[in-house]
Each structure stands twice: as C-alpha cells, then as structure tokens.
Curated annotation (Swiss-Prot):
Disulfide-bonded cysteines: none
Protein name: Serine--tRNA ligase
Domain note: Consists of two distinct domains, a catalytic core and a N-terminal extension that is involved in tRNA binding.
Subcellular location: Cytoplasm
Principal location: cytoplasm
Classification via InterPro entries: aa-tRNA-synt_IIb, aa-tRNA-synth_II, aa-tRNA-synth_II/BPL/LPL, Ser-tRNA-ligase_type_1, Ser-tRNA-synth_1_N, SerRS_1_N_sf, SerRS_core, tRNA-bd_arm
Catalytic activity: tRNA(Ser) + L-serine + ATP = L-seryl-tRNA(Ser) + AMP + diphosphate + H(+); tRNA(Sec) + L-serine + ATP = L-seryl-tRNA(Sec) + AMP + diphosphate + H(+)
Amino acid sequence: MLDAKYIKDNLEEVAEKLATRGYQFDIAEFKAQEAKRKDLQERTQELQSQRNTISKEIGKRKSKGEDASDIFAKVNDINDELKVIEKVLKDLQDCINNTLLSMPNLPADDVPVGKDESENVEIKKWGTPREFHPEAQAKDHADIGEILNMIDFKAAAKITGSRFVVLKSKIAKLHRALTQFMLDMHTEKHGYEELYVPYMVNNDSLYGTGQLPKFSEDLFKLEGDFEYSLIPTAEVPITNLVRDEILDTESLPRYYTAHTPCFRSEAGSYGRDTKGLIRQHQFEKVELVHITIADKGEESLELLTSHAEKVLQKLNLPYRVVKLCTGDMGFSAKKTYDLEVWIPSQNTYREISSCSWCGDFQARRMKARHKNPSMKKPELVHTLNGSGLAVGRTLLAIIENYQQEDGSIMIPEALINYMGGISVIK
C-alpha cells in the first residue's frame, strides 16, 4: 500500500506514475474524500470538546447540589450527533482505504515505461541456444515425456481436470532432484534459511502481500468453516512471517527460502499455453524472500536475481534477463527482473523466474517494521521475492535442451549425484 501522506503531498506525480501502470487515479475524488474526512474529524473534535465542557459543568452543579437537567439534553444531542458522524467517518475511511488497497506500487525511476511485455527491456543473455539438425527439429517436452511414458496429462485430466499432470518414473525423480538441488544451492552457497510453511493462508496474509483484494479470482479458496486459500506462491506465507513485527535492525537482512506447491486458477489465461507444463493449476517453486532495510532494497534485488541466475548457470540452461516495463510488473512490485529460459520447441525464451523489489509497499500493509536503539521510531522494512526457480518450468527446459535424437534425455552434470548416478533418461 502506498503512503497516504506521500500521495496527498505529491498528487500529480502519483497520478502520472500510476497511469504508466494502467491505473487511473481520480485526484478530484481523492481530494474531496480527504476534505470531507478532515471536516468530519474537526467536527468530532469540536463536539467532544463541547461535551467535555458540559460534563465539567454538570460535575460542578452536582457538587453544589444544583439541578443539571437542563444541560443533560445537550450531552445527549452531542452523543447522538457523534454516533452519526462516527458511522459516516468509518464508511468514508473504508472507502479511502479501499482506494489505497486498489493502487499498485509506484515504479522505480529506472523502470521503463510501457504498456505490456512487448516493451520490456532485455538486460543481458547467458549461454548459447543449442542448434538442432534441420532434419531433427526440437521436440516439445510434452511429446518427449509422453513417448517415454513419464509425463501423463490424460491421467491427470481423469483424476482432476485440465492443467494438471502426473509425472512418473525417472522424470518424477528428476523433478524431485531439481528441488533438492535448488534448496541446497540457496542454503549452502547463498546463505538462506530454509523454511517449511503452511500451504493455506488466511485473508490477512493475502492482503499483506497484495494478492487481495485485486486478485481474488486467481485463488483457490476452501469452503466450509475455514476462510483459507491455497497459496498462489510461497511469497505469501514467508513474507507474512514479519507481519505485525518490529524487527531488530541488526537482524537484517534476512534471507528465506522454501519449496512449496503453488495453486492458481489462471483466471484470464484461457486458451494460453494449454499444452505442457508451462501453465498449470498446481506447480512447485523454490521461493526466495529478502527482508531488508530501505537503503539496501535495490542492492538486494541485484543479489536475489543473481542467486536465481546461478541455478540456470549450474544447469547450463541458456537464458536472458529482462527488466519489466511499468505495464507488465506485478501489482506489489517497484522493480522487477524476469529470467527467461530458452525453450527450443518454441524457439523463444519463456519466464522461469520473476525477481521483484517491493520497497515498503507490502511492509506498510503488514505493519512490518525494524528498529535499533539510535532510531526515534520504527521504520518500515523493504521486502523482495523471486523464484529460485519454478521447478516445473526448469524440468521442461532440461527435457527440451538436453533431448537427444533417439528420444532420450541427458541429465545435467550438476544433477547426476541427485539422480543417484543416473546420467540419461530413456
């Protein structure tokens, strides 16, 4: 959530920046609401002052044994008006809060302005995409897996429905090996603390990281006595660890990682990526989360992104880094780098990780702060998150980039030990 005071002091700037994100901020309406709120608060203070004065007068009369019935009525009238104002003020404040909750984060100054992914800016490339023989074009990962009888979409459709998968045998083992490889790298090489977190969260957590109220349709919600939702990403439970906390500044930065399934309805993506593992209702990620101080926020984004890159480099998967434009960034993000891995069958790069610096946007929603003895009052932390990596998309990238003409799949050297010495799937 944006700082209400900053908005009031910088209305035109905020409106311009929000417009680059496709959000139309009605300045006149906001000013009118703020003016009305101020008037109501001033009237409340005025009435409370009158009530206090009258109450003192009643006390004086009673102490002297005098009748005070003539001014009791005034107190009752004031109390009645205060109740009306309280209701109006609450409704108005709820309206203002809903407006604030609907606003996306303001982009950092170096974020390119653009309407969608076509205007993202490529930062760099790593690795060289493999060239396939003209007579042996790259096969799609879904076809390779089905021929090997190790990826089964039909079984998943029978069990559940579309956009689910059953992995079998050595490909299921490869999926598990990837997860362990990523966790080991981040905990042993990059200094992350590994967490095991709930896969269901309450609404407060979803408001804290920005999934609610805007993205309610993309969530799978439980029915019955529990108002919980399945997590769309481990970012939600991990980041909410610091909700309503005042952290010791000396304990920052904090680096957290967790492997979880993620559940998304994929509302709005009908007809897109209907084949294969690219877009599933249930998929797994190894998530990276940083909690740091404001001065280190942008620097931490570079570090987090490099940690996700290391996974791709160790697996020798060609990729590129793109800086997202204003129109393509996530709701809570201030600045985002996407890592896109090369997919031979599509002859293009596809997103495998999104690394975002959220500034104090989530922290303000969560009331997540830090303090040290030299500070007059607690300050909001900065939060960052990214995939390190999406396991299913890494799996499909390996299947396609390491496919052989005979239909087998070579195992990247970094994973052979995790595969129990298996070097090829056939």
